[in-house]
């Protein structure tokens, strides 16, 4: 219902939901939804507990989480089929800021990585059906900022990011890593992007993970993909209509929610 960037998105196999973001001149608390099978504009769903950009989204078939609300450690949730305002779910633990984080999920577990803290490599997780705080899952394969993620029901893929020893974004990375969602542990090398970049928009179905746009540091329009079950480098998929970054993405079968 509004133009914004740094929105948190997720959904079920019928609805996509999007919360927060920055429409300018200030952050938003609006939650919108779309029906994935039907083209059309987003419709108002409700509101987050506070306005904020850089909110991360994850979901099961019935419940959607918004992590890092108002750039804090707050986690909100909604029931996807029931319009209304978000309710408190718990907190992001381990002293992590919620700002500029990224999330993904299987049908049962959500995964969260804080993309703001310099030197952070900690991955957090929780159970979508059970309210409460996150717990430590493991470490990413390097201390990167703005490293996004997507998943099927088995594996989560992390891609890109940048190293920021001096606060600049000059050291863009081309790393792709993965974790097995059901088993806590550190991320393992998967392959490489064709272009080193950060702020990538990512989504997946059971087979394929898409990685679109990003900054290198200029904004890009490329779309790449990997086959989630097979480690290897990203391959060309196509192009966005315009160069984009800092958006969000979902699908009707992300996180293993569908059978594609």
Task: Locate predicted features.
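Polar, enzyme-active/binding microenvironments
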Residues: 1-260
């Amino acid at each position: 219902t509004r133009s914004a960037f740094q929105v948190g998105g997720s959904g079920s196999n019928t609805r996509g939901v999007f919360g927060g973001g920055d429409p300018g001149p200030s952050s938003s608390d609006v939650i919108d939804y779309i029906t994935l099978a039907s083209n059309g504009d987003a419709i108002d769903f409700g509101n987050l507990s506070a306005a904020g950009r850089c909110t991360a989204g994850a979901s099961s078939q019935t419940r959607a989480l918004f992590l890092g609300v108002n750039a804090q450690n707050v986690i909100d949730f909604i029931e996807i089929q029931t319009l209304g305002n978000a309710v408190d779910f718990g907190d992001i633990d381990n002293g992590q800021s919620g700002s500029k984080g990224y999330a993904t999920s299987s049908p049962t577990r959500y995964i969260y990585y804080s993309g703001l803290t310099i030197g952070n490599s900690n991955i957090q997780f929780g159970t979508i059906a059970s309210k409460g705080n996150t717990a430590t899952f493991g470490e990413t394969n390097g201390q990167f900022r703005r490293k996004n993620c997507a998943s099927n029901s088995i594996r989560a893929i992390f891609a890109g990011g940048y190293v920021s020893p001096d606060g600049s974004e000059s050291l863009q990375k081309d790393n792709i890593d993965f974790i097995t969602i059901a088993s806590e542990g550190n991320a393992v090398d998967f392959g490489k992007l064709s272009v080193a970049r950060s702020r990538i928009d990512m989504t997946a179905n059971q087979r394929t993970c898409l990685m679109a746009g990003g900054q290198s540091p200029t904004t890009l329009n490329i779309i790449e993909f990997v086959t989630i079950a097979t480690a290897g480098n990203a391959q060309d998929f196509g192009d966005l209509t315009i160069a984009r970054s800092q958006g969000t993405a979902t699908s009707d079968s992300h996180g293993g929610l569908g059978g594609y």
